[in-house]
Amino acid sequence: MSQVSIKQFAETLKLSVDKLLSQLEEAGVSGKKEADFLSDDEKMTLLNYLKGLHGEKVDAPNKVTLKRKQVQKLNLSSGAGKRTVNVEVRKKRTYVKKPETVEEPVVEEPIVEEAVVDVPEMDTAAETKATKEAEAPKEKAAEAPVSPETILDVVPEPVPVETDKKHKHDKKKQNKAPVKEEPKHKGKPKPKEKQSKKTLAMSGDQSFGRRRHKGHKKSHNADNEHGFQKPVEKQVRDVPLGETIKVSELADKMAVKATEVIKTMMGFGSMVTINQVLDQETAQLVVEEMGHKPVLVNENQIEDDVVNQDYNGETVQRSPVVTIMGHVDHGKTSLLDYIRKAKVAHGESGGITQHIGAYHVETGHGGVTFIDTPGHEAFTAMRARGAKVTDVVVIVVAADDGVMPQTKEAIQHAKAAKLGMVIAINKMDKEGANPDRVMQELVSEEVVPEEWGGDTQFVRVSAKSGEGVDDLLDAILLQSEILELEAPLEGPAKGVVVESRLDKGRGPVATVLVQAGTLRKGDIALCGMEYGRVRALVNETGEQVESAGPSIPVEVLGMSGVPVAGDDMITVESERKAREVAMFRQSKHKEKKIARQQKSKLDNMFNKMEEGEIQNVNIILKADVQGSIEAIVDALVKLSNDEVKVSVVSSGVGGITETDANLALASDALIFGFNVRADAKAKRLIDSEGIFLKYYSVIYEIIDEVKRAIEGKLAPDFKEEIIGVADVRDVFKAPKIGLIAGCMVTEGMVKRNNPIRVLRDNIVIYQGALESLRRFKDDVPEVRQGMECGIGVKDYNDVKVGDQIEVYERVEVKRTLD
């Protein structure tokens, strides 16, 4: 303790300086002034003096006697019966403090609190230690150094002597700080109680692991403690973070328990579970909050190495890729038929295109690749995909129909993709053709023809007679020459999956439009999450080919699964690399799907809490091609409203299986088959369980069916219809009934038990029910126009002359989506 002045010490004790000086003089510390300093010895002298004034002994007692009395009861049986005898055992033990001898221990600077000495108590450990030493031979006790304390037992037993074992390890103890004397508790020693053994040894401790034999009394009581030091400073770790990471994985990387991460997320206001997937930004915030350093990792490196391939070969001129777009039934496929000299439209259900068709045509003007897209509004995604891979867009507009919604949408797709545009005004052979009106409507969509000073070519054609088709091809080739279309011929093939389907005999089939390089039979192809060796290449006429260059569409067989339409296709060197990338994409897709599901669960929970239960129409959809599924799902989901939600539980390419039927049974779903059929097992289950199943070949019919299902679940509307009006002519009281209004029915009829309104000056003053209806003292069910009657209004007695009573009924009106 550092020296302090008398003034500071008085302030600390909250005494006046004069009083402190007088107490110091009484304690024997004289000659001090206010500015003088007090040493620790002087403070101890003052403390001992003050304790003496209060009757406390400063020094600890040299001798302490402990008395103990124990009473027990013994049950004795004799001839007279059982007797209870009280047995009292008295014990007396004296503790004598002997003067310290041998060496002086290294003592630190004493502090005031150490001067306060209470009566020594003996704890359990000390008792056990003393008992063990008492059992030792007297020769050993004589050799050991004498302890400051010796226990003397008044009971006729040998006096136990506590040996100081610490002196046997003086060399180890000299450099250590002095250990505080352990407090001792009162009580009887337990000689048979064993001390708990420590299992970890300090590094360098030679006594660890030795067996203590009964015959040897050599002490091995070195503290067997662990040798490693607990880290004091918090470790800051570099935590690598990918696009997504589970909570448990994040906790492992930070070397903390998952509960700590969950607590941190709760602090952010987000409830998560140990298996929940976090996005990169959220994980970064958590890592920074917990004091570690986030390291953002590009997990797509393996994917980038495969996808980003350079082409060093020469580029060659390639055929233009032309997408034909327009409104439904405007003659897109018929125009392509005339060019191809084939009848594609007749093969489509309903005469409308429901798949993307890719065809390469060699004309007298050169090769052109055509992509025919559906015109129906449900196929927006298909049209957008067609615009993505094309060079020139031909927008077909019927001369007798004009610009329609899908025509406008096609124009928007072409403008968004910044593609060259050619307008084909079709059906010029029809009587009602009006090309000038079509041109005027297109100008309002900012598509101005060249003859009117714009930059868009307009060609008048007829798919039926062939009028203007050559002019259209010339316009397409002119547009492609302006674009200077080139692509490398050698190197790995790159392309886009235009359409995909599951063929019963050939397996997964992907229609691929090659954009660069050459795709050959036997190449390892990677399409999105699917891969495989190309077993066969089939062109648009059904013939097998050995290779396909840029701008050539082919059907690829041999994929591991049905790729998603719109995925990029690329050939890689080895199947191992393709498998690695495909598996990586699948795992990433699965993680994102789980994250979306978790989010949608929370969203649904909050929506249900806010809006109440929403009716659901669950649907299982199976189709022949991937593009049709995409279009139908998009169209069906758009039918959802605030009251009824359309959920596509499952969708896929291929026939309807028993698994689909079981899923429909579990989720109470409707099964729709689009150009596919159910197998025998599925049919048996569907028939036995009464599951809804319908087959369709035209998309309109599916949409209409789902509309009917939604309308059946909509809550009906109720419409109020006024069926009669009566004027109050007189008011009188009737016994047991109350106030009766004498009325004349002026309109319609008045029916008993119908709801009514009471109007005064054309303002509704009461709304209730008609309780009684009488005519000439007789109860009647109804009274028609022009007749008098008495009306009793339920729970209302304020009817006056001149009021009107309006009788109405609620009519249920079935709601529709239109």
Swiss-Prot record:
Q: Which GO terms label this protein's molecular function in UniProt?
A: GTP binding; GTPase activity; translation initiation factor activity
Which residue intervals are annotated with compositional bias (Basic residues) in the record? 166-175, 209-219
> Where do the segments described as G2 lie?
351-355
Positions of the UniProt region annotated as G3:
372-375
Q: Name one GO cellular component term.
A: cytosol
Region annotated Disordered sits at 128-228
* Segments of this protein annotated with the region G5: 462-464
Q: Where is the composition biased (Basic and acidic residues)?
A: 129-142, 178-196
Which stretches of sequence are listed as region G1?
Answer: 326-333
- Tell me which residues bind GTP: 326-333, 372-376, 426-429
Keywords linked to the UniProt accession: Cytoplasm, GTP-binding, Initiation factor, Nucleotide-binding, Protein biosynthesis
- PANTHER family annotated for this entry? TR-TYPE G DOMAIN-CONTAINING PROTEIN, TRANSLATION INITIATION FACTOR IF-2-RELATED
User: What's its job?
Assistant: One of the essential components for the initiation of protein synthesis. Protects formylmethionyl-tRNA from spontaneous hydrolysis and promotes its binding to the 30S ribosomal subunits. Also involved in the hydrolysis of GTP during the formation of the 70S ribosomal complex.
Q: What is this protein called?
A: Translation initiation factor IF-2
Question: Which organism's genome codes for this protein?
Answer: Hydrogenovibrio crunogenus (strain DSM 25203 / XCL-2) (Thiomicrospira crunogena)
Gene responsible for this protein: infB
